[in-house]
Amino acid sequence: MRKFSTYDLAQISLLACLIIVTGMFKIPTGIPGSEFQLSAPIAVAIAAVFGFKRYFLAGIIASLILFLLGIHSILNVEISIIFRLTVGLIIVLLGTSIPVLVVAGPIGTMVARLGLAFTLGTPFLPLFVLAIPGMVITAVSVYPITKMLYAINKKVAGDHHVRNVL
């Protein structure tokens, strides 16, 4: 296992900041109690472009910062970790093709809601139904965001870091 370079540390920190900032944008979906966080498709795109290790480390850092600042509760952290593990596992096992990216976010959201239902002891269906609009928006927006992040990463890092994401 290679050590992290200064470039890697800066990149992971910037990705954590991107997750934090986009997680604060909550877009109403028209259904009371349901909202969409822009960080979901960004997270899937980060996993696809930068690899699981950078994605997961950035996500852990983002969750830790938000928790320490009091912005997130332990339930928010639980949902985030379950989502990240699920999305990361799907992308590591199935690759970064468009169909995989489109379904990774909604599956991650569904599994995270299942974990939340288990933790709270509440029925899964109401939690899942409220998440459907956000899952649809995530599925639709993940491909353009992935293309954008890939283009930015290629211009900034060059081919060297693009090929060595894992």
UniProtKB/Swiss-Prot annotation:
The chain crosses the membrane at residues 12-32, 33-53, 55-75, 87-107, 117-137. Keywords: Biotin biosynthesis, Cell membrane, Membrane, Transmembrane, Transmembrane helix. The keyword Glycosyltransferase does not apply. It is found in: Cell membrane. One of its GO terms (cellular component) is plasma membrane. It is a multi-pass membrane protein. Its main location: membrane. GO terms for biological process: biotin biosynthetic process. It comes from the Bacteria. Does not seem to be a permease of pimelate. Its role in biotin synthesis is not clear. This is Protein BioX. It comes from Lysinibacillus sphaericus (Bacillus sphaericus).
